[in-house]
Amino acid sequence: MKAKKMAIVGMITLTLAALLWGASVSAQTERADPYVEWSAETRTSLGFRVNGDAVRALLPTGWSMTPVADSPSQVNLSITFMDRHVVLDPQGQPVGTGSSRYMVMSVQARDADGNNSTLIINGISPEGIGSYEVYQPAVTARAERSIVGQAEQTSRVQEVWQMVSASGDSVTLHLTYQQAIPIRRPSTIVIRSGKNTSFTRTYKIDQATDALGVPGAPDSRIESISLKIAGPLYSRIFDGSEALTGVTSTPWYHREIFIP
């Protein structure tokens, strides 16, 4: 009986993924850029003020960042952990194993003409350097998530994210929080490689985000947080002067990727 129940659950999961993918494909003829991938994910993002010089060293020539107003030596940087539950190609077939876990670092920067872009400047991925050619190959890329809820109450969530690169850079997050009803935020954005800025990907996103706040703030729903960042590069960015500016949970995130 248990094996039969598991088989039914597996069939439902695959059927749901196929239906969502089919709905996404039906809209592709409306876009000029080639459609390359669809995914369903869960994400957790952290915003920081960090060492500006260490981040600027990772920017391409001619690009700059605006310093934090009340801390000129610092700039804003985001870390996003991703648990990609289902990843499909344009034919609806799994990309690789069909799932993946990794972490990316991104910044808002502008080129010499003053045009603003989101740049992916680093990360840790089991898939190697990735499409943006900036990720560090992972030796560990682990995600763990426990959800406890009763009836119609919102849930209590515990997460563990552990990312370790072959170079020795690492990020480990332990996070516990009380959920709220997330806000649905569909969007279309263009992301640019921090190494080869002529390479862009357009993301058509349907997501729901839950801003958890900052630990210790009166309106924060974060019960506990432990973050350890180390390694030859990351210890320069996170040199002890960093400040956490916000934590956001994205319990569901559906993305279509288009490449010009």
How does the language model describe each region?
Residues A138-P260:
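Interaction-surface and assembly-scaffold signal
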Residues Q28-V87, I237-F258:
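Hydrophobic, proline/glycine-rich low-complexity stretches
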Residues L77-I79, M105-V107, W161, L173-L175:
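Hydrophobic beta-strand residues in large extracellular and virion-surface proteins
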Residues G10-L19:
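Bacterial N-terminal signal peptides
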Residues V86-Q162:
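Aromatic- and glycine-enriched beta-alpha-beta binding-site module
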Residues M1-K5:
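Positively charged n-region of N-terminal signal peptides that target proteins for export
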